[in-house]
């Protein structure tokens, strides 16, 4: 029998919120005053921290993930050659001086705003070295052998057989720190037939938006891939990252940045049933396999 549940429309200072089975978190006066009808409340089960997701941030992320879900379905009907063409055109648009000019201008604005706020701009400046690195990264994915939907192992017996197929995951969510060159990282999952939604740190949001407008979307269109294949969450709010990682439609959540923030994002994803890959303190993974 289905149960009726009321919507949470307000909070009261001192209100006790159960979590972790036998613990409670207490609503602060600030959280109670800020919470509005339509907002979402996430209780981090690892720590009891109460996270408010404003209604507009939830709606923004919900729409982006919905488009990525549709994009993932449509991507299955596209060819590997189309995906190859996407990476090629994306790299080409970044190489073209006329196309890159508004991206460079947006980056200058981002850098000036960051400096005015006393923020580090070490990884924010989209200089020629970073530009070449982005192009090389995209061309690397372009030249990677297509590896979607193929049989990787099979066993045959009299009257029956079983086979293991490699298949795409689905929608992959990324939360990155504020640096413009994350596009090659995020878009890499498209090579294997996945769609992606990502949020970037506020310092680089203007640059990221310009890259989407002048290079990413034109590359998707030129290759005939669905526009929902790659979606940028155009929000500077940290709550957008929490909304993204609490969306159960994600197949995988990937976070990069400072250790504490990444750990919290991972906790939000895990308690929502989403697999996570976290990179908060640096490190390296090496995968090896037998020679073919």
Q: For each of these PLM feature ranges, what is it?
A:
Residues 1, 102-115, 262-281:
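Glycine/threonine-rich helix-loop capping motifs at alpha-helix boundaries
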Residues 1-160:
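N-terminal Rossmann-like NAD(P)+-binding subdomain of aldehyde/semialdehyde dehydrogenases
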Residues 136, 140-218, 223, 251, ...:
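Conserved small-residue-rich beta-alpha loop and adjacent elements
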Residues 161, 231-248:
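A structured beta-alpha segment of the ubiquitous adenosine-cofactor-binding alpha/beta core
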Residues 188-189, 244, 268:
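Hydrophobic/aromatic ligand-binding patch that stacks against planar heteroaromatic rings
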Residues 198, 231-234, 254-257, 276-280:
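General beta-strand structural signal in soluble alpha/beta enzymes
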Residues 224-231:
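A glycine-rich helix N-cap at a beta->alpha junction
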Residues 287-292:
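Conserved small/polar residues in nucleotide/adenosyl-binding loops
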């Amino acid at each position: 029998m289905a149960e009726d549940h009321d919507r949470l429309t307000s909070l009261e200072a001192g209100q006790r919120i159960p979590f972790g089975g036998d613990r409670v978190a207490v609503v602060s006066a600030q959280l109670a005053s800020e919470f509005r009808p339509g907002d979402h409340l996430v209780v981090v089960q690892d720590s009891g921290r109460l996270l408010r997701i404003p209604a507009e941030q939830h709606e923004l992320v919900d729409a982006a993930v919905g488009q990525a879900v549709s994009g993932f379905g449509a991507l299955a009907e596209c060819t590997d050659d189309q995906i190859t063409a996407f990476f090629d055109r994306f790299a080409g648009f970044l190489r073209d001086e006329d196309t890159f000019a508004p991206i460079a201008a947006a980056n200058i604005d981002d850098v000036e705003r960051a400096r005015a706020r006393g923020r580090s701009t070490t990884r924010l400046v989209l200089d020629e070295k970073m530009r070449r690195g982005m192009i090389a990264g995209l061309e690397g994915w372009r030249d990677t052998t297509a590896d979607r939907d193929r049989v990787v192992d099979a066993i045959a017996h009299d009257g029956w057989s079983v086979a293991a197929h490699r298949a795409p995951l689905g929608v992959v969510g990324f939360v990155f720190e504020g640096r413009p060159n994350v596009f090659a990282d995020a878009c890499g999952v498209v090579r294997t037939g996945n769609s992606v939604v990502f949020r970037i740190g506020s310092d680089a949001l203007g640059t990221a938006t310009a890259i989407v407008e002048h290079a990413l979307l034109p590359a998707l269109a030129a290759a005939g891939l669905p526009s929902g294949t790659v979606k940028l969450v155009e929000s500077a709010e940290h709550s957008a990252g929490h909304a993204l990682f609490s969306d159960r439609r994600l197949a995988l959540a990937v976070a990069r940045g400072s250790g504490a923030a990444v750990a919290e994002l991972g906790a939000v994803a895990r308690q929502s049933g989403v697999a996570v890959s976290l990179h908060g303190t640096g490190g390296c993974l090496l995968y090896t396999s037998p020679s073919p």
